[in-house]
Each structure stands twice: as structure tokens, then as C-alpha cells.
């Protein structure tokens, strides 16, 4: 069994969760903070049999896509600076962990 821990932009998380659930892959969403742009991120905890891990990763990769956004230059500093800059947002970060023991009550 594997545990996929993935951090996904909130703009993509609902469609990723829906697609995983439609394939009968269980997923738990944990709101998380971090990053400096957009509405935020969510951390998904996905427990899967090893045979389903490639399918789960494919779904995440197809739906949590990186994209470009234009934001004010200096957006992350306390004093905004004039001008706009293009940055990359979205995508995902995933950790795949081996599970030695699992219990469900």
C-alpha cells in the first residue's frame, strides 16, 4: 500500500478530488497554507494499493496543471512596487510513501 501526499493549488483541487473519487480512489483533503499567490493550496492524502498508484498519479498530473499568471511586481513584500510580472502557478508537489501497516475501524 502507498500513501500519496500531494499539495495542489485550490483552483485545481476540486476537479482532482472528483476524478479520484470517480475512479473509487479514496482521498482526504486538508487545508494548508503556504505559497505567495492565489487562493491557497490544499494537501491531499491518498491511500492506494500499489497497483492503483500510477492511475492516481496520472489523474493528478493531468488535472493539476501549471499555468502562468500576471501579478503586481513586489506582490509578496509589504510595500507594493509598480509594474507587473508573469509567474508560474498551479501544478503539484507529491510525496509517495510506503505503508507498512494500515487499520480502518
Predicted features along the sequence, with ranges:
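Positively charged, small/polar-rich N-terminal and surface patches that mediate targeting and assembly
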Residues: 1-105
Amino acid at each position: 500500500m502507498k500513501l500519496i501526499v500531494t499539495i495542489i493549488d485550490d483552483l485545481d483541487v476540486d476537479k482532482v478530488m472528483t476524478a479520484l473519487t470517480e475512479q473509487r480512489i479514496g482521498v482526504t483533503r486538508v487545508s494548508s497554507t503556504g505559497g505567495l499567490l492565489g487562493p491557497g493550496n490544499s494537501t491531499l492524502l491518498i491511500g492506494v494499493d500499489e497497483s492503483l498508484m500510477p492511475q492516481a498519479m496520472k489523474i493528478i498530473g493531468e488535472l493539476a496543471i501549471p499555468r502562468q499568471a500576471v501579478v503586481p511586481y513586489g506582490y509578496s513584500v509589504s510595500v507594493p512596487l509598480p509594474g507587473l510580472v508573469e509567474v508560474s502557478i498551479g501544478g503539484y508537489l507529491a510525496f509517495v510513501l510506503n505503508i507498512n501497516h494500515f487499520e480502518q475501524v
